[in-house]
A protein has these predicted regions:
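Secretory targeting and sorting signals
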Residues: 1-38
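Hydrophobic alpha-helical segments
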Residues: 441-570, 649, 653, 666
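Substrate-recognition/specificity elements adjacent to catalytic centers across diverse enzyme folds
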Residues: 40-274, 279-285, 296-299, 303-306, ...
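Stable alpha-helical elements in mature extracytoplasmic
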Residues: 151-162, 285, 415, 430-434, ...
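Gly/Pro-rich active-site capping loops and adjacent beta-alpha segments
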Residues: 66, 70-121, 324-372, 501-556, ...
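Terminal end segments
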Residues: 537-615, 707-824
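Charged, long alpha-helical assembly modules
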Residues: 643-726
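Glycine- and hydrophobic-rich flexible loops that cap the catalytic core of alpha/beta enzyme folds
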Residues: 296, 302-308, 316-321, 325-487
Length: 824
């Protein structure tokens, strides 16, 4: 099952190997813990190299047992490579800046580690990071500003484990079998991947615009370089700029989101807390989760999901606490508008004194050999010069003005330290303390519960220290448009008094300290679905934060509204158990349907002759759709008839009809969960959306009342697996996003959505009560037995019972134990 070449493979002697693992547990528990200074090769049982004991249970979930952090990293790197060698290797090509060399300069990236549109711009960015020594400098910084010794040992061990697996096994995944770009890595490579994840919401989103930035004369002659759009537009139109900035930072536009809810002891059956975590992440590529349990006896014992390439558990649980993250609304960057030296467009003025930009010349090797492609990047005291934030917000570099991007997470390599510290916490107070000490989360909220019944919501993310006062005092005209709309500050870079400053409790300059983070402690429930902190608990709104953290008293998404309705009702009902969390995950209620389907059916029935006019002007008989809408059960279960029709109809209607014309009752901050509501049956877009949907499905041979699962599915091993859940537009908790492909039968592949799901509680015993599900399985290798096993469970709305305690691990009927070791 788990390829291993050598004496560590123990399947023929399974029980003996199980006892070996138990013995190692007993020995290391009794022995004093290795210090960071003495942990490493001289302590391994393999004659000088690192090693670990890995016990695999059902669905290929590894329980990694090690004596210190280096050995734990080794076991984790080994086990990740066994499941995801090709995806990991692809990511290491990215952070090395070598995609153009292996895959072609003009080919599109997979978007896992940046938003670069082409391999060339990706390489120019990451090669520039590498040649500047950015990651090495961050690694050298002393903790807490830099990574701890424990984390460095984990990264060193992870690289050694990954390399050992590659050296001792043959890759069977066709994605990279025999590929020359699969190569050994170093601890710096592991850290470089962590850096990419840290900046993915900031510099990583602006990679094309960093590559495109050239002084005016040079930009005019660099026809072969990447471009980001016109040099006129929203930058000179305040309303358009505000909308472009809002859209650029809208969490709903990107392929990451999440739901999570923590319930306090007053709402549960036994007084212990409960946590349901449901991150919405990509199903393919380098931002997949991967499950494991990591154990250093007496030091660490944590189970959960890790982002690929990460040596720690990012979301999960231990004996006392459970936590998850949701993508936050904080704007992780700001711009500084530069006033340029009239004599030199590569110099800018600060308090009247010119400062030269730093010129970084970066060369990238491309396929076919020959001369490398060389470009120049321009950096300032604030960060890199950019020519826009996506095509919608051009920021032209003229003779008098340029724009620099400040991303404080480019100085943050602490994310894995935060995860490690949370994994060692014993209460939600301990989690809060871990966040305060490490301050490593770049773009997520934290929701947590503990065995004592405590709950926590906090938006403890690394953000530029942009106060509303600073924005009011220092915003340029562009910033006065973008900051209220999106939290994107554009500050006057020519004024020294517009520097960001520091908070006394911040571990790096220019960011907010954790004391400023929106936080809610010990509420009966704390929930987030990627809106701002305001309605983490609708009965106790969170207020008082600066605009850069998110909005207050503004409309919530349908997913937030539906989630708050559900979890507040659950909390009011009380007596909750893990089983209630499982029911919530797969309730598949469609809030948009509850709000609009009945009125849409009435509007349909009122159409003269049952005919509506489509977008192309053709009359379409929609009479058959009226009964489908009326009879639909308002769910996104695989057997639901009408869910597919409503989904296609609702997308078309909301894309063409502004909210002010769609609802009769507008949004009210006094009633934010229930407004806006009451569909305007007279809205002209309803008939058109009905006609377009009937025509679309008819052309594809799909009946209006076709069950959702017949047309929302994935194919694994030649088997079609129906997929439950619904889209962001529908507001479904169990979010599923799939590209529409009528020729292939509807939605034939999920691109992102529910991923590492966990429902966790406690019953007073030593072992947490946990059910988990990794929707896409542990492995991307179609030859692996764990390529689709959990996808089948997801299709059937079934769960994996977690094995956390030692007796449960050893009792697994599918137990397989391996003892990988480093060969020297």
């Amino acid at each position: 099952m788990h390829s291993f070449d050598g004496p560590g493979r123990t399947r023929p002697l399974l029980r003996r190997a199980a006892l070996l693992g138990a013995a190692l547990l007993a020995v290391t528990a009794a022995a004093p813990q290795a210090s960071a200074a003495t942990s490493g090769a001289d302590r391994g049982p393999s004659g000088g190299g690192l090693s670990a004991v890995i016990r695999y249970t059902e669905n290929g979930i590894p329980h990694i047992l090690a004596q210190d952090y280096a050995h734990l990293g080794f076991g984790t790197g080994w086990a990740q490579a066994a499941d995801q060698a090709c995806v990991l290797a692809d990511g290491f090509v990215t952070v090395a800046g070598e995609r153009s060399r292996w895959f072609g300069a003009d080919a599109a990236t997979d978007g896992s580690l940046s938003s670069a549109s082409k391999n060339l711009t990706s390489d120019l960015y990451f090669k520039g990071v590498r040649e500047a020594g950015t990651v090495e400098k961050l690694l050298a910084a002393p903790a807490p500003a830099g990574p701890t010794r424990d984390l460095k040992e984990l990264m060193r061990g992870w690289a050694a484990g990954y390399n050992a697996w590659l050296a001792q096994n043959k890759i069977t995944d066709p994605a990279c079998k025999g590929a020359a770009w699969v190569r050994p890595v170093s601890a710096v490579d592991v850290a470089a991947r962590a850096f990419a994840v840290s900046v993915i919401g900031g510099q990583g989103r602006a990679v094309d615009d960093i590559a495109a930035a050239q002084p005016p004369a040079r930009a005019a002659s660099l026809a072969a370089g990447p471009t980001t759009g016109p040099t006129t537009g929203p930058a000179t139109d305040p309303a358009a700029a505000a909308e472009a900035a809002r859209a650029f930072f809208d969490t709903g536009r990107y392929d990451m989101g999440s739901n999570a809810v923590a319930f306090g002891g007053s709402t549960t059956a036994n007084g212990h807390g409960l946590l349901l975590g449901n991150p919405h992440y990509p199903w393919q590529g380098g931002r997949r989760f991967w499950q494991s349990q990591q154990t250093i006896p007496g030091e660490l014992n944590v189970s959960g999901g890790s982002l690929l390439g990460t040596p720690v558990v990012n979301i999960g649980f231990n004996e006392k606490v459970a936590w998850s993250h949701t993508v936050a609304t904080g704007t992780p960057v700001n711009l500084h508008q530069l006033t340029l030296d009239p004599a030199d467009p590569t110099a800018y003025l600060v308090d009247g004194k010119p400062e030269k930009m730093t010129r970084r010349q970066v060369s990238v090797q491309v396929t076919g050999g020959g001369s490398p492609v060389t470009r120049t990047q321009w950096w300032t005291r604030y960060g890199p010069v950019v020519t826009g934030l996506g095509p919608g917000l051009p920021l032209p570099w003229t003779a008098g003005t340029a724009y620099a991007l400040n991303d404080p997470n480019a100085a943050n390599l602490r994310g894995s330290d935060t995860a490690l510290a949370i994994g060692r916490a014993r209460s939600v107070t301990g989690i809060q303390d871990a966040l305060k000490r490490t301050q490593g989360l770049p773009w997520v909220n934290t929701i947590a519960a503990d065995s004592a019944g405590g709950t926590l919501f906090t938006q403890s993310q690394v953000l530029p220290r942009i106060t509303d006062e600073l924005a009011a005092r220092c915003s340029t005209p562009l910033g006065r448009a973008t900051y209220p709309a999106s939290g994107l500050a554009v500050l006057d870079g020519a004024r020294g008094d517009c520097a960001l400053g520091s908070d006394p409790d911040a571990v790096q300059p220019g960011v907010f300290g954790p004391g400023k983070a929106p936080t809610l402690r010990d509420a009966p429930y704390a929930e987030n679905s990627n809106d701002s902190a305001w309605l983490a608990n609708a009965e106790t709104p969170v207020t008082g934060y600066e605009r850069i953290w998110g909005t207050l008293a503004t409309p919530r998404s349908l997913r937030t509204r539906g989630a708050v309705e559900d979890v507040s009702a659950m909390a009011a009902r009380g007596g909750l158990t893990v089983a209630d969390l499982q029911k919530q995950q797969f309730a598949n209620r469609v809030p948009a349907g509850d709000l609009a389907a009945a009125d849409a059916a009435k509007a349909c029935a009122a159409l003269p002759g049952g005919v509506a006019t489509a977008s192309d002007g053709r009359p379409v008989d929609v009479s058959g759709a009226c009964a489908v809408l009326a009879g639909w059960d308002r769910s996104a279960d695989t057997g639901s008839r009408g869910a597919l029709f409503f989904d296609r109809f609702w997308r078309k209607l909301t894309a063409s009809t502004p909210a002010k014309d769609l609802w009769l009752v507008p949004f009210s901050a006094a009633d934010p969960v229930r407004t806006p509501r009451t569909l305007n049956q007279a809205a002209p877009g309803i008939g058109r959306a009905l006609a377009d949907t009937v025509a679309e499905l008819g052309a594809a041979g799909i009946a209006p009342d076709a069950p959702l699962g017949e047309h929302q599915f994935v194919v694994r091993g030649g088997q079609r697996l129906p997929v439950p859940g619904g889209t962001e537009a529908l507001g479904v908790w169990n979010k599923i996003e799939a590209p529409w492909n009528a020729a292939a039968g509807g939605y034939p592949e999920v691109v992102h959505g529910s991923s590492h799901i966990q429902a966790v509680g406690w019953d007073g015993g030593r072992c947490p009560v946990a059910r988990t599900l990794l929707t896409y399985g542990q492995s991307s290798n179609p030859n692996s037995p764990h390529y689709a096993d959990q996808t089948r469970l997801f299709s059937q709305e079934r769960w994996v019972t977690s094995r956390f305690c030692e007796r449960d691990i050893l009792a697994s009927p599918q137990l397989e134990v391996v003892w990988p070791r480093e060969r020297r």
